Regions:
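A polyanion-binding, active-site-adjacent surface
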Residues: 1-124, 140-154, 160-161, 173
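Alpha-helical scaffolding within the catalytic cores
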Residues: 124-135
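Charged phosphate-binding loop/patch that engages nucleotide di/tri-phosphates or the phosphate backbone
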Residues: 166-182
Length: 182
């Protein structure tokens, strides 16, 4: 189950969303998914449907693995991050053994650091966290904090062009060690 890249989002969504799409994600026309595809494409990574012939270069997961009640923007509890991070997220990272982990948003980034017991000197803004770059986990795994790629964040905090720039160091980290990589 090895993958060079692991992308960690916040949560899977709601029970209503799950039931509406019969357990499958609405892959086309969902702004978050479309934006994530663009960002991944910018670093040379493509998402394929399950069962498609692929290299296993990416593993997608979330900091919270359960479904929540309410709408997709419904709040999540801090204890869900603590519980899922310790019991599920850290073991997932250890099993997948990615070279790079991308944390989609502040909450996903905090969940990863908390799962590993990493104390981080938090700057005043998440923008500064993103600008400071990656943090190393054990076994030289790099965690890159980036903004979430949902439409609301893209429209209010960090547009697509800025996010594409945020992902450039991720591309370099994935290529490091490859022949001819910078």
């Amino acid at each position: 189950m090895d993958a060079d890249l692991m992308v960690v989002g916040q949560d899977w969504g709601t029970t209503d969303y799950f039931l509406k799409w019969k357990g499958l994600d609405q892959s086309q026309g969902n702004p978050t998914n479309d934006n994530l595809r663009r960002l991944l494409h910018s670093i040379g990574v493509e998402i394929h449907p399950p069962g498609a012939d692929q290299r296993g270069e990416i593993f997608l997961t979330n900091a919270i693995l359960c479904l929540k009640q309410g709408n997709l923007q419904a709040p999540v509890r801090d204890e869900w991050f603590r519980n899922c991070g310790r019991k599920f997220l850290k073991p997932q990272i250890q099993i997948v053994k990615p070279k790079v982990v991308v944390a989609l948003g502040n909450k996903a980034f905090r969940a990863i650091l908390n799962a590993y017991g990493i104390h981080y000197a938090w700057p005043r803004t998440y923008r500064r966290v993103v600008e400071l770059g990656c943090v190393k986990l054990p076994k030289e795994i790099l965690v890159f904090p980036v903004y979430h790629c949902g439409a609301r964040v893209m429209n209010t905090h960090r547009d697509l062009e800025a996010q594409l720039n945020d992902w450039k160091p991720i591309s370099k980290a994935l290529r490091s060690g490859e022949e001819g990589a910078a």
